[in-house]
Amino acid sequence: MKIPSGRCNMAAAMETEQLGVEIFETAECEEGNGESQDRPKLEPFYVERYSWSQLKKLLADTRKYHGYMMAKAPHDFMFVKRTDPDGPHSDRVYYLAMSGENRENTLFYSEIPKTINRAAVLMLSWKPLLDLFQATLDYGMYSREEELLRERKRIGTVGIAAYDYHPGSGTFLFQAGSGIYHIKDGGPHGFTQQPLRPNLVETSCPNIRMDPKLCPADPDWIAFIHSNDIWISNLVTREERRITYVHNELANMEEDPRSAGVATFVLQEEFDRYSGYWWCPQAERTPSGGKILRILYEENDESEVEIIHVTSPMLETRRADSFRYPKTGTANPKVTFKMSEIVVDAAGGIIDVIDKELVQPFEILFEGVEYIARAGWTPEGKHAWSILLDRSQTHLQIVLISPELFIPVEDDAMDRQRLIESVPDSVTPLIIYEETTDIWINIHDIFHVFPQTHEDEIEFIFASECKTGFRHLYKITSILKESKYKRSSGGLPAPSDFKCPIKEEITITSGEWEVLGRHGSNIWVDEARKLVYFEGTKDSPLEHHLYVTSYANPGEVVRLTDRGYSHSCCLSRHCDFFISKYSNQKNPHCVSLYKLSSPEDDPVHKTKEFWATILDSAGPLPDYTPPEIFSFESTTGFTLYGMLYKPHDLQPGKKYPTVLFIYGGPQVQLVNNRFKGVKYFRLNTLASLGYVVVVIDNRGSCHRGLKFEGAFKYKMGQIEIDDQVEGLQYLASQYDFIDLDRVGIHGWSYGGYLSLMALMQRSDIFRVAIAGAPVTLWIFYDTGYTERYMGHPDQNEQGYYLGSVAMQAEKFPSEPNRLLLLHGFLDENVHFAHTSILLSFLVRAGKPYDLQIYPQERHSIRVPESGEHYELHLLHYLQENLGSRIAALKVI
């Protein structure tokens, strides 16, 4: 391959705003690069061989700065306007963070000044909102429910993980330790200048309370989940009431399959929905001066879902753990919507709680629906809404559900029939939008409903990938048309009976890039100026930026953040300030505050003014060398991106052992212009020891459009390694220090799966595979994930076979010291059974392997000692079997 102008196609994606052009930092080709036939044969470089104790000290030294970096990460920002016209501050911004030596997440705030001195950089001070209080827990002290939710949310910190806030009253609500707490700041009570001592929400519940939420219609009331049922509590009167009675807290899980208000495993793990109940934002007034508060909730029946048992002495008092886990091709939970109406008097006391169910069964009203992906309420509380998916996840519906569609739960058949007959025929679900794709639908969080201005219309902004293959914003107006279906006439409704016609659909954004809508990204709508703010990849698939455009008259999309960095942003409710947490490959994250303004006659062209710093960059890390980003044109026609970590003391005339770090699965992008020195610091450690480290995003990874991501539809495991090998060979053609005879591969979860695939499919390329928590048999994995990408197992037998390494164990190499498996014994996501069944087939085929079990760990390694041991084992195994001179002797 010829190299233009004697330079390699290597880029750090560093761009300068001042020049107004895209500037790539390129790396000079190493001496001897090119295709010269007479270049001297390079000698292998062997990494130094350390003892286990020496490696342990080396890791401890590299982690000193790493711990400091992890402690400085404010997040979950919320702006509250100050109302004092003569005061020096315009807003107070709240956030969660860890400070100093304290490793516990807690609430902080900073004051935003009305004016700044533009000649100096203002650093906002972090002020603790909460006084110290006893709510700390070590990892091993979490309840089972908390452990599992933390796994689903990928939470690794202790302390406060989330908070709820009611703007009108200034009420904060949060869970800490085993308790639920509340405080007031802002609102009619003014703003505190001293840390507040949280108030414990007292309870009669014996077990952990989860998922607390403030009632937006009356912040004196909260709801929470206790033992798979919904409870409510009044913060003022301290009255507490259980409002659902579906779970019996039986010791035998098989006899107690129902839950209320709880998102089941697949919804949490595969759809990022962690709650199963939703307060109505408005209360209905009663003639006596009281009010009716409503909660929409889902009720699940998991009686047909398989129970998985995990037995381990490390569970201490729990000798066995049991989980409902729907394996692909088997039954999912049966789900329905229900509604609870809480009638309270003028003094706030509960008069009655009415449990209501749908007038007809869920499966009749919502034929073909398998998953409740999202739910909520319209702003006026007139309708609940839900985003629904079929089992194949190729058909999506957005439906409106009126509270009138629910009737009181009644056991007497005649009384129930009278209640059904009392519901007018005109009250039905309304399908206000639907879409279909032949790939799959990626669920996201973008759905903004405008206040209704016409009784027979509803307007909303939604994001869709189905129309163009890239997720973009659309403003849709649907006509709320009365259904043709007449319940009183008998018979069953057809799905089309509830479909509303689309009056208008406006394309807000377009192009071969995507609007971000998951993992914290959403949209902010300025209804007064008819603007929508969003995060997207318009300027580069490797960088996330904040943009604004008009949704009334779509046209120019204006970028608000600086190029050369990747940003994660949060806007104030008035859209006059935004906070960006940003970094790039060279610079650790900063958090800065910006003020937005624009001419009245040109609201889209915002002027961004730097206002203050919330977190300054820690500067370059000692002994850290950032990777270089590269790209190449794949034979598939796609541009693929990768990262290259060069050995720190690169010597000419040497070729170096190479480690391919891999994930390669959907919904993840490893290669981007973000700082990698915290989460992926081990890759720098490998480079410091003398390894080349390569990371490549193959087809199937995210932020590149549905066609790119959908390339492995029905054939997971069959295309990814081709892309990875092509990337390695491309790099070897550019750099002669890459030793393709000494390549190792390592990844976790899907990356562990592909590490096995690599050794099985291309043992000629990969000398060593280190596979963490791998899927080895797709029929053992869950419905929501596996069927989305692979289809139903009955309809794709060949794909399931070719994608399952356990079924092809005979293809693994017969030499020892080439395969290391790592797995947490308590893994509730990719069960340890995946590893054990692979081992059974490897033994049957007479194939060697090495195994490391982590008895206390689930899918993610959380115990610090386990994490240290894992990294030590990784370094030692690579040293002994890939990088050192002794490894070369083993091959001989």
Swiss-Prot record:
Molecular function as annotated in GO: aminopeptidase activity; dipeptidyl-peptidase activity; serine-type peptidase activity
Compartment(s) of residence: Cytoplasm
InterPro entries: AB_hydrolase_fold, Dpp_8/9_N, Peptidase_S9_cat, Peptidase_S9B_N, Serine_Prot_S9B/DPPIV
Pfam families: Dpp_8_9_N, DPPIV_N, Peptidase_S9
Active site (catalytic residues): S749 (charge relay system), D827 (charge relay system), H859 (charge relay system)
EC number: 3.4.14.5
Transmembrane regions listed in the UniProt entry: none
Keywords associated with the record: Aminopeptidase, Cytoplasm, Hydrolase, Protease, Serine protease
GO BP, one annotated term: proteolysis
Record flagged with keyword Ribonucleoprotein: no
Catalytically driven reaction(s): Release of an N-terminal dipeptide, Xaa-Yaa-|-Zaa-, from a polypeptide, preferentially when Yaa is Pro, provided Zaa is neither Pro nor hydroxyproline
Activity regulation: Inhibited by zinc. Inhibited by the serine proteinase inhibitor 4-(2-aminoethyl)benzenesulphonyl fluoride (AEBSF), and by di-isopropylfluorophosphate. Specifically inhibited by isoindoline derivatives. Inhibited by Val-boroPro (Talabostat, PT-100), a non-selective inhibitor, which triggers pyroptosis in monocytes and macrophages.
One CC-aspect GO term: cytosol
Main location: cytoplasm
Signal peptide, first to last residue: none
Function: Dipeptidyl peptidase that cleaves off N-terminal dipeptides from proteins having a Pro or Ala residue at position 2. Acts as a key inhibitor of caspase-1-dependent monocyte and macrophage pyroptosis in resting cells by preventing activation of NLRP1 and CARD8. Sequesters the cleaved C-terminal part of NLRP1 and CARD8, which respectively constitute the active part of the NLRP1 and CARD8 inflammasomes, in a ternary complex, thereby preventing their oligomerization and activation.
Annotated family: Belongs to the peptidase S9B family. DPPIV subfamily.
Record's subunit section: Homodimer. Forms a ternary complex with NLRP1, composed of a DPP8 homodimer, one full-length NLRP1 protein, and one cleaved C-terminus of NLRP1 (NACHT, LRR and PYD domains-containing protein 1, C-terminus). Forms a ternary complex with CARD8, composed of a DPP8 homodimer, one full-length NLRP1 protein, and one cleaved C-terminus of CARD8 (Caspase recruitment domain-containing protein 8, C-terminus). In the ternary complex, only one subunit of the DPP8 homodimer is bound to NLRP1 or CARD8.
Record protein name field: Dipeptidyl peptidase 8
Organism: Mus musculus
Gene: Dpp8
